[in-house]
A protein has these predicted regions:
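Amphipathic alpha-helical repeat scaffolds
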Residues: 5-9
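Structural motif corresponding to alpha-helix initiation and N-cap regions
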Residues: 12, 40, 54-55
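Short, well-ordered alpha-helical segments enriched in acidic and aromatic residues
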Residues: 13-28
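A short gly/proline-enriched turn/hairpin at secondary-structure junctions
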Residues: 28-37
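A beta-strand edge to alpha-helix "cap/lid" segment located at domain peripheries
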Residues: 30, 44-115
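A sequence-level detector of short linear motifs
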Residues: 38-39, 98
Length: 115
């Protein structure tokens, strides 16, 4: 099973133990929001609870032993706009050591820059 598929299944099932096995101890997650970065413990604390974001239409665009790129639609428990999320992951020792995301809000009034 691919690392991204295993991650998505663990996240969707709220399986924090499985996520802990997939995420490298030195993992850094940069969501490019508010200048924050998150560690493995931050990610695990965010997963499996009532406020965990839910994903759909998950697609793996590219994955090999070193990196992966995925896309999904993410819905948040705080009623904020859903987002189309692109994720880049770097792997080390078969685990996610780096994850960065970029997102586009999917609100009805969203307009492409320059339109």
């Amino acid at each position: 099973m691919s690392i991204i598929t295993a991650y998505n299944e663990a996240w969707d099932n709220g399986d924090v133990d499985a996520l802990a096995k997939i995420i490298h101890d030195d993992c850094i997650f940069n969501p490019h929001v508010g200048g924050i970065t998150m560690s493995k413990s931050d990610i695990l604390g965010f997963a499996g609870g009532e406020g965990t974001p839910q994903s759909e239409h998950q697609r793996i665009l590219f994955e090999n032993d070193e990196v992966g790129v995925a896309h999904s639609i993410v819905h948040f428990a705080n009623d904020s706009d859903s987002e189309a999320v692109m994720a880049f992951m770097r792997f080390k020792d078969g685990k996610i050591i780096l994850m960065e995301t970029g997102a586009t809000p999917l609100s009805d009034d969203y307009q492409l820059v320059g339109q």
